UniProtKB/Swiss-Prot annotation:
The family this protein is said to belong to: Belongs to the argininosuccinate synthase family. Type 1 subfamily.
Protein name from the UniProt record: Argininosuccinate synthase
GO molecular function, one term: ATP binding
Enzyme class: ligase
Self-association state and partner proteins as the record states: Homotetramer.
A Pfam family annotated for this UniProt entry: Arginosuc_synth
Binding site for ATP: A8, Y9, S10, G11, G12, L13, D14, T15, S16, G117
Principal cellular location given in the protein's record: cytoplasm
Organism: Micrococcus luteus (strain ATCC 4698 / DSM 20030 / JCM 1464 / CCM 169 / CCUG 5858 / IAM 1056 / NBRC 3333 / NCIMB 9278 / NCTC 2665 / VKM Ac-2230) (Micrococcus lysodeikticus)
Length: 413
């Protein structure tokens, strides 16, 4: 029996050509694997048939939209994950779920190697291969673009020569990756970081300079996970999809960043993540209401490290799992509702309520009914400032001694 190679298949030009390219270069049979994480476009059946028409001996397709939303997007939301305080890990969190299906397909079809379409200078090669090696330590990984010299020009020529059922064009200058959590755009004229993005860069969001009337939405959370919009119970996938539509119509979630890649270079990236950014804004505010101060302060450090690990392809690492445990524990009381106004590119908190919150009106109010015992403040201040006061007294004592020595020296002169 011939060796089999699992190929992460998107249905596009590069991976369609990679089926025959890999087979010719290695002599192996290729099994195409397509995973739907909410990227839209063609149906899985259309993609499956194209893979077979391009020479795959088998085609494995998986609708992973709910899995992706519940098991990957929701942990990302709980961690308020924004790499470099901006990027909500759009591509970074899709690679682990795709990798899980690639490894499952390798077991099902008896393959010993997994192939992906990443270049040798991006983050995704690391994310795929680290995830695959973690889930299947016995599996090998190859990348046709990186390892088998498959360039875009060669792919077009190969597709035309072999009459593959795929459109070949050089018209679109951008490299685009998208899923239900967001959309990533790079290359083309965007590589000159002085150039501003043009209207054709965007697809998930409308121009925030010309918004419709404000859209007010109430998001309900249970243990840090959104459960309803405007009183309607919905799944995580449905909530993300609806907020993509509503926040996207208001231009929310546009991000333009020069990003520090894992491989050591800086890269200009454009992201659209209307649903993700609206949810993160709401979740952060609900944490402000429900988390104890020291817990919230420490969680920010954990969130940042969690985000860095996931960006760097360490979704399945021991440390990331340990941080998951801490983050999940902090979400026990993150229950309630946040009211957001979506308008002009912004998701602005207008109201918040929680039965498990730590906001106590009677303690916070300055009006009648104030239950805060202000007489306790003086003793608290004395104790709270004692160490700083003691240090200051030492400095003044030493400075005074030095000043006396200076006066004596001047007198002798």
């Amino acid at each position: 029996m011939k060796e089999r190679i699992i190929l992460a298949y998107s249905g596009g030009l590069d991976t369609s050509v990679a089926i025959g390219w890999i087979a010719e270069a290695t002599g192996a049979e290729v099994v195409a694997v397509a995973v739907d994480v909410g990227q839209g476009g063609e149906s899985l059946e259309t993609i499956r048939q194209r893979a077979l028409d391009c020479g795959a001996v088998e085609a494995y397709v998986a609708d992973a939209r709910d899995e992706f939303a519940e098991q990957y997007c929701m942990p990302t939301l709980k961690a308020n994950a924004l790499y470099m305080d901006a990027y909500p890990l759009v591509s970074a969190i899709s690679r682990p779920v795709i990798s899980r299906h690639l490894v499952a397909a390798a077991r099902q079809f008896g393959a010993s190697t997994v192939a992906h379409g990443c270049t040798g200078k991006g983050n995704d090669q690391v994310r795929f291969e680290v995830s695959i090696q973690t889930l299947g330590p016995d599996l090998k990984c190859i990348a046709p673009v990186r390892d088998l010299a498959l360039t875009r020009e060669k792919a077009i020529e190969y597709a035309e020569r072999n009459d593959l059922p795929i459109v070949t064009t050089k018209k679109n200058p951008f490299s685009i990756d998208q899923n239900v959590w967001g959309r990533a755009v790079e290359t083309g004229f965007l590589e000159d970081i002085w150039n501003g993005p043009t209207k054709d860069v965007y697809d998930y969001t409308d121009d925030p300079a010309f918004p419709p009337a404000p859209d007010v939405v109430t998001i309900a959370f249970e243990r840090g996970v959104p459960t309803a919009l405007d009183g309607r119970a919905l799944s995580p996938l449905e909530i993300i999809e609806e907020l993509n539509r509503r926040a996207g119509a208001q231009g929310v979630g546009r991000i333009d960043i020069v990003e520090d890649r894992l491989v050591g270079i800086k890269s200009r990236e454009i992201y659209e993540a209307p649903g993700a950014m609206a949810l993160i804004a709401a979740h952060r505010e609900l944490e402000n209401v429900t988390l104890e101060r020291e817990q919230a302060r420490f969680k920010k450090h954990v969130d940042q490290r969690w985000t860095e690990l996931v960006y760097d392809g360490q979704w399945y690492s021991p440390l990331k799992r340990n941080l998951d445990t801490f983050i999940d524990a902090t979400q026990e009381h993150v229950n309630g509702e946040i009211r957001l106004e979506l308008h002009g590119g912004r998701a602005t908190v207008q109201g918040r309520r929680s039965e498990t919150g730590l906001y106590d009106f009677n303690l916070a109010t300055y009006d009648e009914g104030d239950s805060f015992d202000q007489s306790s403040a003086r003793g608290f201040i004395d104790i709270f400032g004692l160490s700083a006061k003691t240090a200051s007294e030492r400095e003044q004592r030493l400075r005074g001694s030095a000043d006396l020595q200076d006066v004596a020296r001047l007198s002798n002169d």
